[in-house]
Design a protein with these regions (language model features):
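Short, Lys/Arg-enriched N-terminal segments with co-localized hydrophobic residues
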Residues: 1-25
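Generic alpha-helix initiation/capping and coil-helix boundary signal
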Residues: 5-9, 39, 127
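Hydrophobic alpha-helical elements and their junctions with loops/disorder across both membrane
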Residues: 11-13, 53, 141
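Sequence-level detector for tyrosine residue identity
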Residues: 18-20, 66, 82, 159
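Conserved P-loop
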Residues: 26-96, 152-154
Length: 161
């Protein structure tokens, strides 16, 4: 409970500083078709967050393409190296990351669909689990999805910023 309380307090303070904290304080989704600038936007958000917070910032991607576009204060993780085969393995990976480092403030996940390897319509449990992890550990999740926002299931669409 104290971490969740601190999380809400931190979010209120950071909301004024961070224009990307509009939609939801726990999970945010950047959705758009391929080539619409999602990765550039999520990288900018991660770099801004690294400057504006004392918490650790983690950026998870499926390969090393954008590693050098990130500030050195951002911890880059190439999840492709961990052979995640499905959404359950992905959630185990996320749970492990948040449980081993209590100083993580935000986790940015690029190429979410490639990492979960599941049809988005079957991932409602993933988003519910991310909410629980966020509430318990005080970590915000920012995801990018290569999908037209109009085609997203309602349980994801509510997080789109």
């Amino acid at each position: 409970e104290p971490r969740a309380k601190a999380h809400r307090k931190r979010n209120a303070a950071n909301k004024a500083k961070n224009p990307y904290k509009e939609a939801c304080p726990l999970i945010q989704v950047i959705a758009g078709k391929k080539g619409s600038g999602k990765t550039k936007r999520i990288i900018e958000m991660a770099n801004t967050a690294a400057k504006d917070t004392k918490h650790d910032i983690v950026f998870i991607d499926d390969d090393n393409r954008y590693m050098f576009d990130l500030s050195r204060e951002v911890r880059f993780v190439n999840a492709g190296e961990y052979e995640l085969e499905n959404d359950q393995m992905f959630m185990g990976f996320i749970s492990g990351a948040t449980s081993q480092n209590f100083d993580i403030g935000q986790i940015f996940i690029d190429a979410f669909k490639k990492l979960v390897k599941a049809d988005l319509s079957t991932t409602e449990w993933v988003f519910k689990r991310l909410e629980k992890i966020s509430e318990k550990s005080g970590v915000d999740f920012i995801l990018s999805l290569s999908e037209d926002p109009a085609d997203l299931p309602e349980f994801i669409a509510k997080y789109v910023i």
